[in-house]
Every structure is written in structure tokens, then in C-alpha cells.
């Protein structure tokens, strides 16, 4: 499914992002997808 959020995509929750990616809740990158190491 290519319709998921990659880095710097807006999100409101982790479900808006790709698998293994999370929606940042804090800081400069608040509410964007980031890779969860």
C-alpha cells in the first residue's frame, strides 16, 4: 500500500504513517511521520 505517510508527511496518529513509522508528538517535527528505530 503506497498510500501511507513517509518522512515529513503530516499525520495525526501512527496509523497515518507507514508500517514501522510513527507520528511524532513533540518538538520541531510534531505531527509528521518519522521512522521508528
From Swiss-Prot:
InterPro entries assigned: Huwentoxin-1
Chief site of localization: secreted
Record's keyword terms, sorted: Calcium channel impairing toxin, Disulfide bond, Ion channel impairing toxin, Knottin, Neurotoxin, Secreted, Toxin, Voltage-gated calcium channel impairing toxin
One cellular component (GO) term of this entry: extracellular region
Disulfide bonds: 4-18, 11-23, 17-33
Pfam families assigned to the protein according to its UniProt record, in alphabetical order: Toxin_12
Organism domain of life: Eukaryota
Expression sites (tissue/organ): Expressed by the venom gland.
GO molecular function, one term: toxin activity
Protein family (similarity comment): Belongs to the neurotoxin 10 (Hwtx-1) family. 01 (AU5A) subfamily.
Summary of the function given for this chain in its UniProt record: Blocks calcium channels (Cav).
Free-text comment about domains: The presence of a 'disulfide through disulfide knot' structurally defines this protein as a knottin.
Protein name: Omega-sparatoxin-Hv1a
Organism (species): Heteropoda venatoria
Amino acid at each position: 500500500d503506497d498510500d501511507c505517510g513517509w518522512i515529513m508527511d503530516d499525520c495525526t496518529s501512527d496509523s497515518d504513517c507507514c508500517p514501522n513509522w510513527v507520528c511524532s508528538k513533540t518538538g520541531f517535527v510534531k505531527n509528521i511521520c518519522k521512522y521508528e528505530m
